[in-house]
Amino acid sequence: MQKKFTFELAGRTITVETGKYAEQAGGAILISCGYTALLVCATVAKQAREGADFLPLSCDYEEKMYAAGKIPGGFIKREGRPSEKAILTSRLIDRPIRPLFPKGFYNDVQVVATAMSVERDVTPDVLAMNGASIALSISEAPFAGPIGAVSVGYVDGQYVINPDFEQRSRSRLHLTVAGTADAVMMVEAGANEISEQEMLDAILFGHEYIKQIVEWIKTIQAEVGKEKIVPVIHTPDEELKAKVVEFARAKVEWQLDTFDRKEREVRTEQVKAETIAHFAEEYPDGAADIDAVLYNLMKEILRDKIINKGIRPDGRTHTQIRPIWSEVGILPRTHGSAVFTRGQTQVMTIATLGTLGDGQTIDGIGEEEFKRYIHHYNMPPYSTGEVKSLGSPGRREIGHGALAERALLPVIPDENEFPYAIRLVSEVVSSNGSTSQASICGSTLALMDAGVPIKAPVAGCAMGLIKDDSTGNIAILTDIQGLEDFMGDMDFKVAGTQSGITAIQMDIKIKGIDKQILTRALEQARQGRLFILDRMMETIHTPRPELSPFAPRILQFSINPDKIREVIGSGGKTINGIIAETGVKIDIEDDGRVFIASTDAAAAEKAKNIIDNIVRDIQVGDVILGKVVNILPIGAQVELKPGKKGLVHISKLSNKRVERVEDVVSIGDEILVRVIEIKPDGKIDLTRKGLIPEEGRR
């Protein structure tokens, strides 16, 4: 049965159509707002995936170029691999819904959101998140939602829900928040150094609107929702569980009774092997269940030690940060480099400077975007002591790179101040938690080593949460390591300067967190960030005054935009000739700004002089060194600048009478000439008289 539902949110109408499209999907809707529309479908497999010990949930956001009235470029004319924006949107959909499936539910669940029509004032990402929540809610999937999602801007001191294009361009905050009616589930934000209180208020402001969205989705579910399947939850046999816990509790406590990670890993494998061997005869096929029981037992003991005894796996207090050391200038041939180490997490970041032409133009279904600052994050398998095949970056690497890029963006100098494209690459060479935040710290150091005049240094710190649902006790942990992230309930990354927050990313494994936890976590993160910044400044406290000798020097000046065509020349002939002659790289913007890049200052200056001569208006009386390009019976044609020629009449070639032009000049000669007349049709008359001494026949 076809149904249409509408909802007013912040002055816009959201429309959902059900029962009309994709009827074989578990739950399918067309959700639209303004001219933006997405088809969102959710489907759940009937059986659990064999051998799975995790929720096999996949969320895919697809951009179709027809949504913006475009035809894909290239020979194939078909959409290719997902764009970075599409991958980040897929992650946004996944993160708030994943914790709301039952533990032990191993059926495949797939959510596909396809952007079918877009306008610039309504971004499809938040609409896709709400669409996924609705599709899952009306499907048979055992989804403990719904959730709602909004974006929040901060424009002229006011919070704005789902800001339009113009508001986004002026906003100090770009926040996406998702949650249930009771709690916040996910936060993703980039900001221009806003305070912790401003960020908290923005999150809570957004949550008030989320509550309205959730109530609306519940009415849709009540009217058209399918009956939920009874999930088959795989749990180990209770008798086996009791026996393993009794046998292994003391062993697991011993396993965790060391602050050394490597020793703990050795003990973990030893306890696992001993326990499986002990029950091998009684439970010959029970290895997987025994492993699961041991994992849960370790998690229980570890969380109890942290919450009730204040002991973390490596012996730190709840607010203590791991030992930090850093260096800069570690790679001599690069433009800037740094290594940042925090505990067993180590990241090398390399900065490369280029011309604006080296920036990235992104032409997707939204507005065409140009990026002159790019950050890439790589995490090879050796960083965790594993052996795996190398491949293209995965969703996690792309997400971490985008987070670090967002964290540094507010402090990158304006292109008028620093006319360079900047690429940062963070190589994780050792990983034990918080690698994305270490890449932010390493990026700050590498930028300063490269001589980039950043507005302020940026550091990042990852916060964790352990919550005991039975008692309500919580522990908020500063600078979490891998085990605490794996066993904990929250991964809350906060990056910023001394003045404020520049980026946030929060993922929750439980059913949301409240205002009290958010407030404490933000303040604890601020204190941790300031401590880390102090340590970083001991390595390098200001950007280097000079660029690397291997970095290009960029000469910037402006010309009349009407003269750009003259500089470029027919088919690029003029500008390519300048590049070939001087060896420089030239970029010209539509507004007339010219950027000349070269490691040779003299070559850059020569190219500038050539361009100055090209764009300079020729006037009567000018004396110019020109090149003879053609010999005519009546005189010589002289190129005064690319694309501009004049004629020296035979009677004006010399201070005395000339019988033949060839007697005085030849093609290719460079001669001084004076402009004596510029005719209405643009033709230029020249003379050599008065510029040369008496000449004889050649």
Language model segments and positions:
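Flexible, glycine/charged-enriched surface loops at secondary-structure junctions
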Residues: 103-109, 144-146, 213-231, 262-263, ...
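Conserved phosphate/anionic-ligand binding catalytic regions in large, soluble enzymes, centered on
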Residues: 27-29, 122-140, 328-351, 432-452, ...
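Mobile "lid/hinge" segments at catalytic clefts and subdomain interfaces of large enzymes
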Residues: 140-256, 447-545
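Glycine-rich, flexible beta-strand/loop modules in the N-terminal catalytic cores of phosphate-handling
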Residues: 13, 25-110, 115-122, 181, ...
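Extended amphipathic alpha-helical scaffolds
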Residues: 1-30, 34-45, 229-367, 552-566, ...
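Alpha/propeptide regions of enzymes that mature by internal proteolysis
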Residues: 2-5, 9-12, 26, 37, ...
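Long, charged amphipathic helices and adjacent flexible linkers at domain junctions
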Residues: 227-238, 531-557, 605-625
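Single-stranded RNA-binding regions, centering on S1/OB-family and related RNA-binding modules
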Residues: 550-554, 561-698
